[in-house]
Design a protein with these regions (language model features):
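Metal-dependent phosphohydrolase cores
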Residues: 1-79, 83-196
Length: 196
């Protein structure tokens, strides 16, 4: 089906209009991994004062997780944990979490969403902030896992001499992780449209 819907206000939409939109959505959704990778590449050359640029940091974080035997979903969370830096200077973990939310486990999502607070353990005190801010989550089931993510992968990923895997290595993983949402208000409609 090709074409465009004809309404100028959604209240005037018809079944035919929404069939056109749904068909287009499926094709568009399949390109999500490519769009995410394009956005991730915006981090290249952006050092923000750090020893490596933000793309290198992301690749290093994911490479360390992969080489440590983490599963693909975890590795993609590691790759994308700072993708929000470009649009969410004050809440970058929330941006990454919003992208990942339909596709990853609640455990990995929480880790990505909270990593900024947990990472603060290493530097908040230099900025006049409370480095122990993560303690508010001490009773959360993902508390130790998020400490581990930051300590082993995120905080350690600023080494200019580390041999990171290339972005192309992670592309097939991206395709698999983003192939089908686990949770979304559109999940049932998307699945129905793909089988039609």
């Amino acid at each position: 089906m090709t074409g465009q819907a004809r309404f100028t206000h959604m209240q005037d939409g018809t079944q035919e209009d929404w069939a056109v939109i749904a068909a287009d959505f499926s094709a568009y959704a399949r390109q999500l991994p490519a769009r995410i990778l394009t956005h991730l590449k915006l981090l290249e050359g952006d050092f923000g004062g750090f020893p490596v640029d933000r793309l290198t940091h992301s690749l290093q974080t994911a490479s360390r997780a992969w080489r440590d035997g983490r599963d693909e979903e975890y590795v993609i969370c590691a790759l994308l944990h700072d993708i929000g830096d470009t649009l969410g200077s004050y809440n970058h973990p929330d941006i990454a979490a919003a992208i990942l939310k339909p596709f990853v486990s609640a455990e990995n999502l929480w880790m990505v969403e909270k990593h900024g607070i947990f990472q603060g353990y290493y530097f908040f005190h230099y900025l006049g902030m409370d480095r122990h801010l993560r303690e508010q989550f001490r009773e959360h089931p993902q508390y130790l896992a998020t400490i581990e993510f930051c300590a082993k992968y995120d905080a350690a990923a600023f080494d200019p001499d580390y041999e990171s895997l290339p972005l192309s290595f992670f592309e097939p993983m991206m395709e698999r992780v983003f192939a089908q949402p686990r949770q979304s208000i559109y999940k049932a409609a998307t699945a129905q449209n793909q089988t039609a």
